[in-house]
Amino acid sequence: MWSCRVISASAIHTRCMNELTIDAVREIEQIHSKWIEYEVAEDDHSLMALCADDIELWPPDAQPRLGRAAVSAQIARGMTRIHSIEITDRRIRGSDEIAYLIASYRTTFSSSEDSTPGRALGSHLWILQKRTGKWAVTLVSWSVWGHADISSPLTGS
């Protein structure tokens, strides 16, 4: 029988990524939902409380931000006001120590330069690790498939 500890980093055995308990999946779903709630509310402090000290933020159009201080500074500098985030196709896989979450999103936002609401459509990838009995976000990466004014229908929905 294969063990996750025996498998090399270059070849993840699929059985190792199907060991999350229902409770762990629910906990991760709750963390994801809270993140979105805090992001919309601009509650940076609560959002950062969900993160590990070695959090990594990998935006699609900028250099990665590594560590709590850099990620916190990036989030605080936000020039965009998020009005809502809709999540679809959320999937969570992992083991009892590490998990990943992938989902599609549709975000309604406005910028400090232009108050006209716009939309972004894309996907994001999260990696979470269980540390001292609690799940913590260790990496967030996302892609943007398209942008549109709120009055324009966005394809791919």
Language model: regions and residue ranges:
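A beta-strand edge to alpha-helix "cap/lid" segment located at domain peripheries
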Residues: 6, 13-49, 56-157
